[in-house]
């Protein structure tokens, strides 16, 4: 079995010091780059090494600034545009020119903007419930709907609300949030997700990407209003059952 190796990547983005925690595997084919979602980490994708059909593919996954084992010197500066710059810097550090891209939630939005800015580098894009419309801000819009006195107060109340969300595995997700995301990073991430979802023309950016595209979603989100539209534009849909 071709296992992965764990490494650290030291970067500076907009004057912010980063120590990126990453896992990767070498190989001869174009690599798969994974960008995790909000409240998740690189380990979400480590089981790629257990998939025989992907055994020939190298891959790279890392903890985004504000998440997991990655160190960030100024958490308040993190936003989706900041995460896009980070992704580009990580790719350049790893000498990755062309790649297959998969992103979930926050990582899906980051991946979309990364693909839009670098269409010649992305060979395929699997968007796992990443934001492409205002209706996708069911978590991030809470930064507006539930104002709080400070970052820690918002985060603690967010964790409690998430515990009771009627979505599969919400209690498990809620229980892990304090271990996977820094409270001080949440406002910048959520605010930029809302701004981009409302005004960033994400749908147009997504359907106009020249690479093959897949949109994955859970069965609880099959009522998303745009699924038929993106399918008509050539996006492959993949519904995941419970």
Where are these regions (language model features)?
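N-terminal cap/lid segment of alpha/beta-hydrolase-fold proteins
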Residues: 1-18
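Active-site loop/oxyanion-hole signature of alpha/beta-hydrolase fold enzymes
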Residues: 16, 60-102, 106
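Conserved HGGG/HGGXW glycine-rich cap/lid loop of the alpha/beta-hydrolase fold
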Residues: 16-71
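Glycine-rich His-Gly loop
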Residues: 34-37, 105, 218
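Conserved catalytic-core motifs of eukaryotic protein kinase domains, centered on the activation segment
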Residues: 44-46, 70-76, 137-139, 226-227
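Flexible "cap/lid" loop of the alpha/beta hydrolase fold
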Residues: 112-116, 123-154
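Conserved alpha/beta-hydrolase catalytic His-Asp/Glu region
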Residues: 137-138, 152-209
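Conserved serine/cysteine hydrolase catalytic core
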Residues: 187-241
């Amino acid at each position: 079995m071709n296992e992965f190796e764990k490494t650290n990547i030291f970067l500076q983005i907009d004057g912010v010091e980063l120590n990126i925690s990453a896992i990767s595997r070498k190989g001869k084919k174009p690599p798969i780059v994974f960008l995790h979602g909000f409240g998740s980490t690189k380990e979400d994708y480590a089981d790629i090494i257990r998939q025989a059909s992907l055994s020939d593919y190298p891959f790279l996954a890392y903890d985004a600034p504000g998440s997991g084992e990655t160190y960030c010197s100024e958490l308040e500066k993190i936003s989706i545009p900041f995460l896009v710059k980070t992704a580009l810097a990580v790719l350049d550090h790893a000498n990755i020119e062309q790649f297959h891209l998969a992103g979930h939630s926050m990582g899906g939005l980051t991946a979309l903007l990364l693909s839009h800015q670098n269409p010649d580098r992305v060979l395929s894009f699997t968007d796992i419930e990443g934001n492409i419309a205002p209706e996708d801000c069911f978590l991030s819009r809470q930064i507006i709907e539930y104002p709080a006195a400070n970052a820690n107060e918002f985060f603690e109340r967010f964790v409690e609300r998430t515990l009771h969300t009627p979505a599969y595995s919400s209690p498990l997700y809620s229980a892990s949030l304090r271990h996977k995301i820094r409270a001080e990073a949440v406002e910048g991430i959520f605010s930029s997700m809302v701004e981009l979802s409302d005004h960033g023309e994400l749908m147009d950016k997504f359907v106009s990407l020249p690479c093959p595209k897949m949109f994955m979603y859970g069965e609880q989100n099959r009522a998303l209003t745009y699924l038929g539209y993106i399918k008509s534009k050539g996006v492959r849909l993949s519904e995941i059952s419970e």
